[in-house]
């Protein structure tokens, strides 16, 4: 499990990205890089990390499911992910 503070920080970044998305879009189209630079650093979408919704793990996360590889495998083998089954050929 990731530290709660790390997960909370990432959630705060998500909120900031959502809040400033329209303003950032306008400034980019206008080419006003000085005003863009004055926006909060964490309002940039590239600072948000995809994290597992169950464990908060930041690496090995399947974006489609929002789960890290460990939880994905566990839930898939338990049959809790609809439409997912173990491959065999």
Curated annotation (Swiss-Prot):
Keywords, alphabetical: Ribonucleoprotein, Ribosomal protein, RNA-binding, rRNA-binding
PROSITE patterns: RIBOSOMAL_S14
Highest taxon above the source species: Bacteria
Gene3D superfamilies in the record: 30s Ribosomal Protein S14, Chain N
One MF annotation (Gene Ontology) recorded for this entry: structural constituent of ribosome
CC terms in the record's Gene Ontology section: cytoplasm; small ribosomal subunit
Keyword Cell division: no
Protein's GO biological process: translation
Keyword presence, ATP-binding: no
Oligomeric form and interacting partners: Part of the 30S ribosomal subunit. Contacts proteins S3 and S10.
Protein family per UniProt: Belongs to the universal ribosomal protein uS14 family.
Function: Binds 16S rRNA, required for the assembly of 30S particles and may also be responsible for determining the conformation of the 16S rRNA at the A site.
Protein name: Small ribosomal subunit protein uS14
Gene: rpsN
């Amino acid at each position: 499990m990731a530290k709660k503070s790390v997960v909370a920080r990432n959630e705060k970044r998500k909120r900031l990205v959502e809040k400033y998305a329209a303003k950032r879009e306008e400034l980019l189209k206008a080419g006003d890089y000085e005003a863009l630079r004055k926006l909060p650093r964490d309002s940039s979408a590239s600072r948000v990390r995809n994290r597992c919704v169950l464990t908060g793990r930041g690496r090995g996360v399947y974006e489609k499911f929002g789960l890290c590889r460990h939880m994905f495998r566990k839930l898939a083998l338990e049959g809790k992910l609809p439409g997912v089954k173990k491959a065999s050929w």
